[in-house]
Amino acid sequence: MARVKRGVQARRRHKKILTLAKGYYNARRKVFRVAKQAVIKAQQYAYIGRKQKKRNFRSLWITRINAAARINGLSYSRFMNGLLKAGITLDRKVLADIAVHDAAGFTALAEKAKGALAA
């Protein structure tokens, strides 16, 4: 059986990790063993960050909707309940965008929500 030397594969594997570690400081960029740990940790942070981004944006949208709803005399929960009863199905992202860029449109939505709550 032929002898297998793994120099090419090792070089390729090391190069892949060291390329991913570009922009890191000192040994985290130059030493394979340290760079590998740094890259793995960075990928973990990136994965977690992608999940947190969804939570953070939802929280931001709710805050913006709440602020605009209170200007129109409703709390966030009563506003959302009013929209549900009125049969208006807009997601929080769109509602927050309307609240920021179209105050008159949001006021109209708030009036419909108030009407649905009163009925």
Curated annotation (Swiss-Prot):
It holds the Pfam family Ribosomal_L20. Keywords: Ribonucleoprotein, Ribosomal protein, RNA-binding, rRNA-binding. GO terms for cellular component: ribonucleoprotein complex; ribosome. The keyword Transmembrane helix does not apply. It comes from the Bacteria. GO terms for molecular function: rRNA binding; structural constituent of ribosome. InterPro entries: Ribosomal_bL20, RIBOSOMAL_L20_CS, Ribosomal_protein_bL20_C. Binds directly to 23S ribosomal RNA and is necessary for the in vitro assembly process of the 50S ribosomal subunit. It is not involved in the protein synthesizing functions of that subunit. Belongs to the bacterial ribosomal protein bL20 family. This is Large ribosomal subunit protein bL20. It comes from Xanthomonas oryzae pv. oryzae (strain PXO99A).
